């Protein structure tokens, strides 16, 4: 019993001690005044105020050891800029608050930030998102939310992914709406996306004023819109857009997070008007703390919806409580101006001595909040991820995410390894339902529905009418256009998967540069003609892909390089070959005579006769079989070799001479443009583009001559420089095809001195038609249609002229080459070797038969005597040469040989 009494006394003692410590701790807690400026009465403000109260309650219940307590004073700004400023002034002057949470809008925040800077009172906003607030450069301004401009990169990636080339922003006409525009414009320029116009909606716009803006948007070609409006104005805007017909198939609407973050609290009617739109939404990562908070919120406030602004208000309050606790309780005073001085309340604004220290602690605060990682960097929260949503059904459906390091991706926990330039949108986002309840990706623009047809300028005066030809209809008095360019453009229009209405407008007030400039001035929507693509023109217009081959050709006359005279028969062989051949005739005849002289009567007789026989025998081989018979073995070998050599030589000579007499050896009179420039010769041109290139190359004005038609060009080239014509002309390769198709036997293209991109269709800079037209050109080129048009319009007038593109040199320049000794030296060498061997054999045999004779005269006499030891010594002279013949038959010849032996 005694033990039990002691235990009770001990417990009672500890309880008394604990209560005394708690009382002392409560006495040590310091209250710190904090102001809240909000538009009381709106759904958003009520939600954020509840979140602020829950944040303070949660913080101090989980941190009972803190020495400070935030005491809040709520002031209604009544959705008015002046009232908000007055509220802040009252809080600073009369309540001496050490920080202010709020205000709600960016316009209200501007003046409050200035007051906070002057009084050293931090302004912590959880809903003012305009980027323009950062330009105030106040170190006492903290944005516990995301800057609107932080989402423009996500918007850019969406536009880039689908390849849209024009975007029209829609924004409210105030600080909030205008703040995002500079950064949005910059990022769109990075991907060459134009902003052709902007739709600015007044904050107080009536439904009729909104309808007027929507009707204007409907008449313009751009179909991609980025909407940056506050929630109430956005609801009215999309209601009218649905009513007018701007939410049907073909339109693209991209919402900023100002709207998508509050989709959860919009009613069904408002959501129904936004079906199919895309949006960038603030990403809130899942966490146990967030789920617990949502559960408590639903139980306590079942009729109030929670969104990200409430979470930011909760986190901002927690951050402020942490910062004040760290800053301590020293210097919680204001230094005010002397009350005796006659100054206004603003001029007499006090300065908080607590502000600098609170500024430092706020800048260091970092924790995991309900909305994600909370840390001020340069006074702002920095987003790492945005959510991409597609409004479908009852709300926004997540279709992907955006992160700075990875771009767009489907799942937040499955990031791609890197940004893939050529990936399709299906690889980056989940399926999308577009306006009009379609899954087909809108092309982003279309011909406006205001009945306007494309006005296409076409030149009337054209040098090469195969491209564009204008004729006057005598019945309707209208201009009818035809030609390759016209037919090709119509084929391209048919290849585009949508209808384009257009009218051809004749242009006859200038050249092609003037016509192209009309597109820049807005008089024409396009130009269809044989317009050369050049860098100078591309500075103020856009070109489609070229629909013809590229390049500029140098066309010059050709002439026959061979002079046909009475001595042309000597040209096939070089002088050396002629001399060697003549010498060879004599040598071969001499060798055969030496070998046959002692055994063959046909090579015997008077000296004059024998000399003529030498030449006669060797030369007659070229025409017919010689009458003299060759009897000795070595003579026959020599003759056979000579026969072959003469055959090859005569056949080659005949072929070469025939080529000289029958083939035109055409050579260009000029080989390159540099030779024209060096000699100062005249050059013809047709277009202003080529004129400019010639001037840039150094040609003088006096040497440049314009031609107006293919016939005129032919006349100038035919005259030549000496007779007032030109030595060469420069023309684009497509024109060369036409010109040489008519005059291929007189001229040829020898060089392409200038590189150009060919001929293309002209459009205004940034026209969305350019991409579709270019894609359609590729389709036409890949089909058989392009070849059909070329065959129809570029058929050569002279049917003997081939296509200069597929056969650029129908009359190739043949450089005549005379036959020289180098082509036959092997044959002459063989003949020389055989002759030498035969002579050596003969001399050896002759000296062997006369071993003791050294007297040349005696040897000559022996040489002139018939060889009595030869088996053919009794052969008589051939009747064809002297009336005597060989033995009548073979038996007599054999007997004669036997008798001789």
Swiss-Prot record:
Extracellular side: 26-574, 651-823
UniProt GO cellular component terms: plasma membrane
Transmembrane segments: 575-595, 605-625, 630-650, 824-844
Keyword Glycoprotein attributed: yes
Residues in the Cytoplasmic compartment per record: 596-604, 626-629, 845-901
Keyword Glycoprotein: yes
CDD domains for the chain: GluR_Plant, PBP1_GABAb_receptor_plant
Tissue specificity annotation: Expressed predominantly in roots. First strongly detected in all cell types of the root except at the apex. Later expressed at the root-shoot junction.
Coiled-coil ranges (or none): none
Topology with respect to the bilayer: Multi-pass membrane protein
Residues of this chain annotated as glycosylated in UniProt: 46, 53, 204, 267, 331, 342, 461, 477, 536
Function: Glutamate-gated receptor that probably acts as a non-selective cation channel. May be involved in light-signal transduction and calcium homeostasis via the regulation of calcium influx into cells.
Family of this protein: Belongs to the glutamate-gated ion channel (TC 1.A.10.1) family.
Name of the protein: Glutamate receptor 2.1
Organism of provenance: Arabidopsis thaliana
Gene designation: GLR2.1
